[in-house]
From Swiss-Prot:
PANTHER family: FIBROBLAST GROWTH FACTOR (PTHR11486). Plays an important role in the regulation of cell proliferation and cell differentiation. Required for normal regulation of the hair growth cycle. Functions as an inhibitor of hair elongation by promoting progression from anagen, the growth phase of the hair follicle, into catagen the apoptosis-induced regression phase. The lineage of its organism: Eukaryota, Metazoa, Chordata, Craniata, Vertebrata. Belongs to the heparin-binding growth factors family. SUPFAM superfamilies: Cytokine. This is Fibroblast growth factor 5. Residues 38-72 have a biased composition (Low complexity). Keywords: Glycoprotein, Growth factor, Mitogen, Secreted, Signal. The gene is Fgf5. GO terms for biological process: fibroblast growth factor receptor signaling pathway; glial cell differentiation; positive regulation of cell division; positive regulation of cell population proliferation; signal transduction involved in regulation of gene expression.
């Protein structure tokens, strides 16, 4: 009788523990939890408010990837800073002049560099560039009559073909204007006084120094890269000890005998 009673108590204990374990599993998954005391209402409200605040705080974070994506799409349509070169164009004609672009549309050269001579050269297509004055914020252009001027808007007149010469100078020819009969290109040029020459002039040729410009750009400081090169060296032969050389013996000076003749 005692064994059967103990067996029943053991089975009831197992059933009770299994039921309690199953209830704990169901509660975190959204199943209705056992009823709580009315005094815990304030705690539940506090927890609900904390949950709402955390969800509201996480909402801008979720929205941030969209904003970042729109920014990346917008930045893809902008000019790449690596495609722009800022500096000056130095023409070696006469005493040497820096190309200048004025806010009023005038273009000429000055021997001394100034803020008007700071230019920005950017690529438009393969071999075609545009030149903009940083201070005047206007583009270098050549009219259909070959006259150089500054334009507030970037048009086809502002496109120039950049070529590199063998003497490390560059030439800039209009991309659309040229002589119709001969097909001769019109180049950007300055005379000996620093005034802009007409590109249609027959004297403006790519071989003349008036069309040669030396780009002077500011190079960004790059960190110095150092490395060590090891060259295999041949083993030097062991140094032999110096043996003092024996001085040659001096031969004794010959003895001279004088013959004496005696006559009886």
């Amino acid at each position: 009788m005692s064994l059967s009673l103990l067996f029943l108590i053991f089975c009831s204990h197992l059933i009770h523990s299994a039921w309690a374990h199953g209830e704990k599993r169901l509660t975190p998954e959204g199943q209705p939890a056992p009823p709580r005391n009315p005094g815990d209402s304030s705690g539940s409200r506090g927890r609900s408010s904390a949950t709402f605040s955390s969800s509201s705080a996480s909402s801008p974070v979720a929205a941030s990837p969209g904003s970042q994506g729109s920014g990346s799409e917008h930045s893809s349509f902008q000019w790449s800073p690596s495609g722009r070169r800022t500096g000056s164009l130095y023409c070696r004609v006469g005493i040497g002049f820096h190309l200048q672009i004025y806010p009023d549309g005038k273009v000429n050269g000055s021997h001394e560099a100034s803020v008007l001579s700071i230019l920005e050269i950017f690529a438009v297509s393969q071999g075609i560039v545009g030149i903009r004055g940083v201070f005047s914020n206007k583009f270098l252009a050549m009219s259909k009559k070959g006259k150089l001027h500054a334009s507030a808007k970037f048009t086809d007149d502002c496109k120039f073909r950049e070529r590199f010469q063998e003497n490390s100078y560059n030439t800039y020819a209009s991309a659309i204007h040229r002589t119709e009969k001969t097909g001769r290109e019109w180049y950007v040029a300055l005379n000996k006084r620093g005034k802009a020459k007409r590109g249609c002039s027959p004297r403006v040729k790519p071989q003349h120094v008036s069309t040669h410009f030396l780009p002077r750009f500011k190079q960004s400081e790059q960190p110095e890269l150092s490395f060590t090169v090891t060259v295999p060296e041949k083993k030097k032969p062991p140094v032999k000890p110096k043996v003092p050389l024996s001085q040659p013996r001096r031969s004794p000076s010959p003895v001279k005998y004088r013959l004496k003749f005696r006559f009886g």
